[in-house]
From Swiss-Prot:
<keyword id="KW-0689">Ribosomal protein</keyword>
<protein>
    <recommendedName>
        <fullName>Large ribosomal subunit protein eL15</fullName>
    </recommendedName>
</protein>
<comment type="similarity">
    <text>Belongs to the eukaryotic ribosomal protein eL15 family.</text>
</comment>
<comment type="function">
    <text>Component of the large ribosomal subunit. The ribosome is a large ribonucleoprotein complex responsible for the synthesis of proteins in the cell.</text>
</comment>
<dbReference type="GO" id="GO:0002181">
    <property type="term" value="P:cytoplasmic translation"/>
</dbReference>
<dbReference type="GO" id="GO:0003735">
    <property type="term" value="F:structural constituent of ribosome"/>
</dbReference>
<dbReference type="InterPro" id="IPR024794">
    <property type="entry name" value="Rbsml_eL15_core_dom_sf"/>
</dbReference>
<dbReference type="InterPro" id="IPR000439">
    <property type="entry name" value="Ribosomal_eL15"/>
</dbReference>
<dbReference type="InterPro" id="IPR012678">
    <property type="entry name" value="Ribosomal_uL23/eL15/eS24_sf"/>
</dbReference>
<keyword id="KW-0687">Ribonucleoprotein</keyword>
<keyword id="KW-0963">Cytoplasm</keyword>
<dbReference type="InterPro" id="IPR020925">
    <property type="entry name" value="Ribosomal_eL15_CS"/>
</dbReference>
<dbReference type="GO" id="GO:0003723">
    <property type="term" value="F:RNA binding"/>
</dbReference>
<comment type="subunit">
    <text>Component of the large ribosomal subunit.</text>
</comment>
<dbReference type="Pfam" id="PF00827">
    <property type="entry name" value="Ribosomal_L15e"/>
</dbReference>
<dbReference type="GO" id="GO:0022625">
    <property type="term" value="C:cytosolic large ribosomal subunit"/>
</dbReference>
């Protein structure tokens, strides 16, 4: 087994004494920093490499802190107007994961970079911490490499805003396996529409 395999096993056993201590100390460290800052290197090099990171020019890691919990509807003094069924303010659940929110914030902050992927690095009772892998699409090392040329195309601008990253696709219900059967046909809406449309085929 290589070194990354051992690191992967360490991260799998998060309840071990070593990992509990490490995660607790790191969470304290991350809380002292700003909610979005550049990391000098990935905290989990094995995970980052599996998601496409390379230790070369053009790759950047940003660490993002996201507040945990449900979403409160931003309305003044709870005045929502309309019918009582839509009066909810406090117990609102956001449709996307906190990981996709972290990707979006990093993408907004670094508008010229492209979000490749992200991964979890820690959490406490109040916050979750994610590291986001970003790529500079104008760097020669990225543009000349056939493996990374795809992300330099204009169609991949702000892919994190449109649910095209791994975390975004999961929130949209897109994927393989029995967990994603509600989106056969492209999206949740397309699948629902097909199932609820009565088709009376003509007898010939």
């Amino acid at each position: 087994m290589g070194a990354y395999r051992y690191m992967q096993e360490l991260w799998r056993k998060k309840q071990s004494d070593v990992m509990r201590f490490l995660l607790r100390v790191r969470c304290w460290q991350y809380r002292q920093l700003s909610n979005l800052h550049r990391a000098p290197r990935p905290t989990r090099p094995d995970k980052a490499r599996r998601l496409g990171y390379k230790a070369k020019q053009g790759y950047v890691i940003y660490r993002v802190r996201v507040r945990r919990g449900g979403r409160k509807r931003p309305v003044p003094k709870g005045a929502t107007y309309g019918k009582p069924v839509h009066h909810g303010v406090n117990q609102i659940k956001f449709a996307r994961s906190l990981q996709s929110v972290a990707e979006e914030r990093a993408g907004r902050h670094c508008g010229a970079l492209r979000v490749l992927n992200s991964y979890w690095v820690g959490e406490d009772s109040t916050y979750k911490f994610f590291e986001v892998i970003l790529i500079d699409p104008f760097h020669k090392a990225i543009r000349r490499n056939p493996d990374t040329q795809w992300i330099t195309k204009a169609v991949h601008k702000h892919r994190e805003m449109r649910g095209l990253t791994s975390a975004g696709k999961k929130s949209r219900g897109l994927g393989k396996g029995h967990k994603f059967h509600l989106t056969i046909g492209g999206s949740r809406r397309a699948a629902w529409k097909r199932r609820n449309t009565l088709q009376l085929h003509r007898y010939r």
